[in-house]
């Protein structure tokens, strides 16, 4: 049924109609905490991807992928008879959504096949790339995930065109529903950017000074990176370089990596703009059911091959678009460039007074003059980019190596530690952006050691709440998106984490000094090479203190190692510092987000469910673990004991709450006596105001809720403490 005939925009079944978010758009939503559960996985809760992958014929898969590169299909023919450039773009656009500020995006979950990514304008026609892969995915089944296959295909594509690669690691399990946690922007129109610059700077139209809102890295809604025509479509290479630098830095790429990726990526393939985009139909998510997930139906001539429309630009960068070369940089500096229009009406650049020697993608008798994008010329017009580009031009081996390393980083930046990596092509060289942690090459502590260490820790004189606080501070840096942070490595003792305000540096220093002495004493008394890492000891100390506070056993799993300062990129790790952390009652609302929204966001990074979030906050409050030692949210007369008092007192109808300090904090007042009994934050009161969180809080606040709170808190605590111990699963 065509769009004009479709009456089902507001269906009266399957969840259609007006929703709560339509009535109350500012209401705190918990959807992001209910995603990617075992119930949503058709492979079942017992399926283990790492085990399935071990049975994969990896070399057979790579051979099939290499054969696919030149197996051009009539329904979507390959440019130049080779799909290499097409699949490089697919891999790039799958991984390239990663941003370092919040660790979200990237290719680690196979989200490229789900909305909105599968229908972004910048991903035009990549639905065909995924469809070309289906026979191979079908053949190998669940031994290879879509997430791994997308990126491995791009790697094989480069190899098949003579490019150097640095290696490849599999290990990305698929998810089975569209990601609902990532903030892609507030714009409501494709390719809009009014909100992301309005929220980031005073003058959103000044392309030379405006600031992109954090944590975004893309300059338009629906683009992976920058506008290839220039900022807002203005063909200004200098301003374009500014956008490029902002975007690539937020992807964790420095200037050299940025130049290598752009120059290397544009060595291959072409762009597509045979005619205006008015010839294109709906994107996959908006296409009719008979399209079977394919979108952008093209009414221009054949609608494929030489008539393809994607970006609207029509550029073939080199004379060897299916072979690695240095021609891209050679042409960039050899020619002067003049602004022209593509057949689709887009701004692009053509070499002045140059002969036509660039091959056509389909007609062997047709040649084109060299052409470039505004973003290409940015590498020549920006001084730093130009310097790097000229060095690569003069040193092709450096260029090839830099591209291989930057490409590897692009594909693996959100993979997490090497304990997650699978396959025979894992490079031996460790890179600083991997957040390396030494391998354990010594016996780890036994249960007897654990028991003895707990006794020594608890008698050390350090407040038990401070031990819990330190363990939480160490473990809760974990980000489920890019698998960074966590307790392994004990980076809480290193810059920059040791100096973060949220970690209360003076208190942290005292705790770490005491634990360091216990560590030294234990290690010096051992024979046979056994040692306890500070990373393990920090978590053990928290567990021991919690055990004392709860009166029940708390599990502990050893196996962490201590990273060095040299293994820690200070600038990169600075992205993990929280603006607000409701678990520790740190921070306050910003003009863009209330404190309770940031609490849920942090809970999502920790892969928590709504009940886990609720139990943890309520438990941490009565354990007296606020970052600054304040009584905010400590709704109990017996701080330091794990009880359900937080919920009992928050839900007490005899208490009324009055906002203070711009409604960031609230006084709990006895309705009869007007006595001020408590003070709480937005991160506290949300458990009584948000209906779904209140429902959970009522379970814990009931007369029979104390035992359940203790049980659930310890389970959630144990989960957080071990989030980055991926080896525990295997």
Swiss-Prot record:
Protein encoded by which gene:
katG
Name the catalysed reactions. Answer: H2O2 + AH2 = A + 2 H2O; 2 H2O2 = O2 + 2 H2O
Required cofactor(s) = heme b
Crosslink site: Tryptophyl-tyrosyl-methioninium (Tyr-Met) (with W-92):
225-251
Active site feature: 93
Top-level EC class, please?
oxidoreductase
PANTHER family found in the cross-reference section: CATALASE-PEROXIDASE, HYDROPEROXIDASE I, BIFUNCTIONAL CATALASE-PEROXIDASE
Q: What is its EC number?
A: 1.11.1.21
Identify this protein by name.
Catalase-peroxidase
Q: Which organism is it from?
A: Blumeria hordei (Barley powdery mildew)
GO CC, alphabetical: cytosol
